Amino acid sequence: MAIDSPSPATDSIRVMLVDDSAVVRGLVTRILEGEAGIQVVASVGNGQMALASLERNEIDVVILDIEMPVMDGLTALPKLLQIDPGLKVIMQSTLTLKGADVSLRAMQMGAADYIPKPTSTRDLAGGVDFKSELVTKIRALGQARRAGARPARPGGPPATRPVIASTSPRTPVPIHPPGPLQLRSNTPEPPDIIAIGSSTGGPQALFTVLGTMKAGTVRQPIVITQHMPATFTTILAEHIGRVSGWEAREAQDGEAIRGGRVYIAPGDFHMVVETKGTDKVLRLNKNPPENFCRPAVDPMLRSIAAAYGKRVLACILTGMGADGMKGGQAVVASGGTVIAQDEASSVVWGMPGAAATAGICSAVLPLPEIAPWIMKLAARR
């Protein structure tokens, strides 16, 4: 049964739940009802019902299950985005290889993010981690949605929404950093290594950057920290390999870094670089989370700055929070270069915005311009 709620206050983030389990929808609704500034305005059991509900309601964020009768999540996703291109869709997926693969395919198709689905309704009802992650992502994506104009629909002009001022008490850092853009006026050094950090919206940004920067276009190794759990990072490496032709894989502890390869931090491990004789090697550790994340971008960048000095190019892509900003400061202090994705092309301009407004970036670029910028600088080495 489809449920449409009365129109909420205009400053609420409007959420639609799409899941064939009425029990799951009910539990998630109860979680969100206790959060100020969030309201579930529709709750439906399959993709076809979601399309009909989207035509009737103004929605900011959709929580979309993958496996459903009548119309599944992957089939519904492009249809939802066709109706409302600015819609933020969070895929709900199991922590399995199949679930990770489908979630990453969905992000290639335009989904903004994913959330691991608890394995039982008991975990769903009582899981503090699930609630915290869900609410944080809804707030981040809802705010990103409101930061610009809602795309026009047939029969009416576009409607702008106010930026949401309230944040969840569990949200660890500001979603959108304050302050003006501040660019460095330095001459970037050609790099010996390229480091990329990303979070919310990161997989599709990585596919764009690496898909443009095909294997063989640069000789330098590429190291990536994307905020993701184990299993998902395994599949991320496979997807990057397919779209780019690079030899891409999860990093292994102690392996020497080689040019022309892509190394991805495994879920639940920080990835850092150490010097061992004449080699640079990757080390994995379970040191405490930084910026509430493991893997985190900051420890990766700090270690690379220490190992490579000025021959580092760090790129901060879309993501909530400020992970990568302090690590970027270490890169700049060692003479290296930092660039970031611009606000207009970011799903959430938290991480790149923090770097851009901290005065450490040599360039802040639209997503399609990042790979050409990297390739031009890398070719000088």
Curated annotation (Swiss-Prot):
| E.C. number(s) listed in UniProt | 3.1.1.61, 3.5.1.44
Looking up InterPro entries in the UniProt record yields: CheB-like (IPR008248), CheB_C (IPR035909), CheY-like_superfamily (IPR011006), Sig_transdc_resp-reg_Me-estase (IPR000673), Sig_transdc_resp-reg_receiver (IPR001789)
Listed disulfide bonds for this chain?
A: none
Spell out the catalytic residues.
S199, H227, D323
Segments carrying the region annotation (Disordered) are 143-173
Residues bearing 4-aspartylphosphate are: D65
Question: Does the record's keyword annotation contain Signal?
Answer: no
Residue ranges spanning the membrane: these are none
Q: What role is this protein assigned? A: Involved in chemotaxis. Part of a chemotaxis signal transduction system that modulates chemotaxis in response to various stimuli. Catalyzes the demethylation of specific methylglutamate residues introduced into the chemoreceptors (methyl-accepting chemotaxis proteins or MCP) by CheR. Also mediates the irreversible deamidation of specific glutamine residues to glutamic acid.
Q: What is the name of the protein in this document?
A: Protein-glutamate methylesterase/protein-glutamine glutaminase 1
Species for this entry: Paramagnetospirillum magneticum (strain ATCC 700264 / AMB-1) (Magnetospirillum magneticum)
